[in-house]
Amino acid sequence: MKAGIMNRRQFLKSVCGTALGAAGFPYIVPSSALGANGAVPPSEKVVMGFIGVGSMGGGHLRTFLGYDDVQVAAVCDLREIFRQRAVERVRRRYGGAGCKVYRDYRELLAREDIDAVTVVVPDFWHALIGIEAARNGKDMYYEKPLAMSIADGKAVRNAVNRHNVVFQFGTQQRSDDKFRFACELARNQKIGKLHTIMVGSHPSVTCPNQPNHPTPDKDEFDYDTWLGPAPWAPYTYERCASRAMGTLGMWTFIHDYSLGGLGGAWGVHPVDIAQWANGTDDTGPVEIQGTGVVPADGLADTAIEWEVEHLYANGVRMIHMNTKTALKRAEQFSLNNGLGVLFLGDEGWVLVEREFIDAEPKSLLTATIGPDEVHLPRSNNHRRNFIECVKSRRQTICPVDTAVRTDTICHLDDIAIRLGRKLRWDPEKEQFINDEQANRMLSRPMRSPWYL
């Protein structure tokens, strides 16, 4: 909130706090507004809007609807079927109207009564919507990835910090005890000196048999608006279908729209944990080199196999791989089908994934982190952490300054694969060293009339 401006919750508190007028005449204030009978008063509720309510966005909507201190006031989606499904769910929860439906996210963001939003849209829309949300003073729960380029991610960071809004990146593994504990084992040298981090990520998929020629737009879908800032391409159903439509969201594996498994489709999650354990949330690697396999035919053209090595200034190596490659590189990955983050020290190792943690020696699994050792921030619920920070104005467990560093690594990996050579990176200046070709890949043009 900008200085000198009263927000909605403060206004409601002031109204309730002055229920007796200047002449001593009592205003009539409903008991629910004062929190009677255990009800959360409106002054303590976070009013939310939801931008993107398909598969993942709809999941967020269901969760936030369950919080008594959240009021869902608006939903927005380009597809009518998603909008109607979402608003019907909200109205069932609240027993009637009170939730408005939008097709244009800008109209939702212009509402002064909305405190916070979720941003759960195709990757190439993230930066535009995130920056507009920040300009409108909206706190945001923002799904990964941060942006379609390193330059756009920095622009999101600048907007969030300039407008002082609360930001939670959708890397919910930071709110999982297993991941925090594994990182604390590494940070406190319980495995000895950390020297290598291996990351196993879900790969992208291929779609050689999917049509990449124009097909009729059977559902009257506004394809031009959906494309937005992305390069023009002929419409096909598969290009822009989503999981909520009962099919795989193929756009996730098209390089004009996403980095696929290397980035927002999965890689951001384990890379984020690698950064946390390495103590490098405010920086990044200094060298990057790797190879990958990129499909030559069909719609999908994000890397399906990759192995990218990063060297940090502290001497730690981080190797980001798809699951198939991870299984070949380290036998520990066979414990979990190639997924997870493996921390290797000179006295032991720990491997962690969402449903799994293992270590050697086994005594590490019951190790105690002492009071004078490194204790990482604790959150047991990523969405609740966001709501509590909206209220307290404190920093979330994964703020934008952390998010941009993780997101950057995924883009560095993609650039290294496509250039096929070693790259030197300056994490302070956030640019490649003496490499004009690589630096040109730090940004992507946007299709007119869209711009940041």
Predicted feature locations:
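A contiguous active-site-proximal alpha/beta segment in oxidoreductase catalytic domains
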Residues: D139, A147-T225
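C-terminal structured subdomain/cap of oxidoreductase catalytic cores
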Residues: V53-H60, L344, V350-W425
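Active-site rim elements
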Residues: F169-T171, D256-G264, G292-D297, I369-L376, ...
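C-terminal helix-rich "cap/oligomerization" subdomain common to oxidoreductases
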Residues: S14-P42, A300-D301, E388-L452
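Rossmann-like dinucleotide-binding domain that binds NAD(P)(H)
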Residues: D224-V316
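N-terminal glycine-/serine-/threonine-rich beta1-alpha1-beta2 phosphate-ribose binding loop
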Residues: M1-D139, A151-V166
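Short basic (Lys/Arg) and small-residue
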Residues: K144
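NAD(P)-dinucleotide binding in Rossmann-like oxidoreductases
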Residues: G298, T302, W306, L311-N380
